[in-house]
Amino acid sequence: VLVQNNDNTLPLSADTKKVNVFGWASTAWLGGGSGSGGVNAVNTDLLAALTAYGIEYNTELTDMYKDFQPGREYVRTLSSRPEQSGRLYEPDINNTAYYTQSMLDNAKSFSDTAVVVIGRLAGESNDATKQQYKRTEKGGDIVVDDTRTMLELTTEEENLLNYVGANYAHVVV
């Protein structure tokens, strides 16, 4: 659902040949169902779709996300605990171990258009958790934020959105 389209950012202009794709969820696309629902295992993720349409994306960013967390950890929802099925992954934009100044400068030079991907999966037998269970460090422990639910933005996602909004002329979330 398109809620806002300020300055006609979408559809992308025919002149837009490059974009920066921010957000770990861009590298671990969500296509799923839970409980008695099902999902067609054949799908196209955002990065493949951009490539198919002839739009280049910044691989320095996507490589960092893939290194940070190589994929979604598989969880059997019927037998999982909330801290397993409700995990959120996102490095903080302010953490220079992930977002180096060089990377951020390169991204600004690469394109003035940014796409931010945020993902959640919940459904039958896989309820949205009342806390946030998140990993913000590569290989780090799961951190619990009791002040926010799974359906709210994480602090890291808010920081990312604030950064991208302040630094890019065209932003798609």
How would you describe each model-predicted region?
Residues 1-173:
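C-terminal non-catalytic regions of proteins with extracellular/luminal or membrane-system context
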